[in-house]
């Protein structure tokens, strides 16, 4: 009987995540657990959430869909689920800030999806100096940091204020789709080590050294940046606008505007950028 219950639970989780992928753009998932924050207090729509509190962090320990609302002050959302499980975080007018670290740290998951609810405005702000429990640690190092694949999508707006290092950092593949995304950073504004894809999104990147970066060098199918499907990207940065190790592609119908202090496109591999799309000005290039 116990074995059967576990099988049913696994099947329910799989159906929930399939529903996440099929949820129409801008709508929330009715199967989500609702998490409402007020300062450092949390109220939930169900009793058994699988969330534990560790040193000021609300730790999600089970895969599934979670809808986040309200204002989390001086805290952190941490995702720490088995590598075989996926997590969807629905931001529905959600604000979070941390005085000591990143407000969102995806430590482990198969992948994580941040879904921005229609009409919602969401803001995350990190600390100017991070405190690590182990001085040897250097992660997280971005306002939103993911150790695994991360997708940000939906028709809402997300503001990310990176005050310590990177604005958004992803160790694997970073995908941005359909949403409005405004990010500031001190070092790299957005970085996906393996890849960055921006599809049909409106993205504004300010501050920092490099604006969009992917630097994996040991795999020929990674280390790429793709801007597609009419994406609109505005960049104002101190160094390179777009930097990748393997390839950069900017499709026709997209626009990349703004100013950079370094190269507009920096890649030792393949560059395929539509000339009309590239409207950005470089301080070092004619």
Protein language model regions, located:
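A composition-driven surface/loop motif
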Residues: 9, 20-286
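Bacterial N-terminal signal peptides that target proteins for export
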Residues: 1-8
């Amino acid at each position: 009987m116990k074995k059967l219950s576990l099988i049913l639970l696994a099947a329910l989780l799989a159906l929930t995540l399939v529903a996440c992928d099929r949820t129409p753009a801008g709508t929330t998932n009715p199967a989500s657990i609702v998490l409402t924050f007020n300062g450092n207090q949390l109220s939930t729509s169900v009793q058994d959430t699988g969330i534990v509190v560790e040193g000021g962090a609300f730790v999600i320990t089970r895969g599934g869909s979670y809808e986040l609302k309200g204002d989390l002050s001086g805290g952190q959302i941490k995702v720490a689920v088995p590598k075989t499980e996926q997590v969807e975080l629905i931001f529905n007018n959600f604000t979070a800030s941390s005085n000591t670290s990143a407000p969102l740290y995806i430590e482990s998951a198969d992948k994580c999806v941040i879904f921005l609810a229609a009409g919602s405005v969401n803001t995350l702000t990190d600390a100017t100096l991070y405190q690590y429990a182990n001085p040897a640690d250097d992660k997280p190092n971005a306002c939103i940091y993911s150790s695994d694949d991360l997708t940000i999508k939906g028709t809402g707006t997300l503001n990310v204020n990176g005050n310590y290092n990177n604005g958004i950092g992803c160790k694997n593949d970073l995908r941005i789709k359909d949403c409005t995304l405004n990010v500031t950073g001190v070092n790299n504004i957005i970085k996906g080590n393996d890849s960055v894809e921006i599809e049909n999104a409106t993205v504004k990147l300010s501050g920092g050294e490099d604006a969009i970066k992917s630097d994996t060098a040991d795999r020929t199918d990674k280390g790429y940046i793709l801007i597609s499907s009419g994406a609109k990207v505005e960049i104002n940065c101190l160094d390179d606008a777009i930097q990748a190790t393997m390839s950069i592609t900017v499709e026709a119908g997209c626009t990349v505007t703004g100013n950079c202090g370094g190269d507009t496109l920096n890649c030792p591999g393949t560059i395929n950028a539509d000339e009309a799309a590239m409207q950005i000005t470089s301080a070092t290039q004619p």
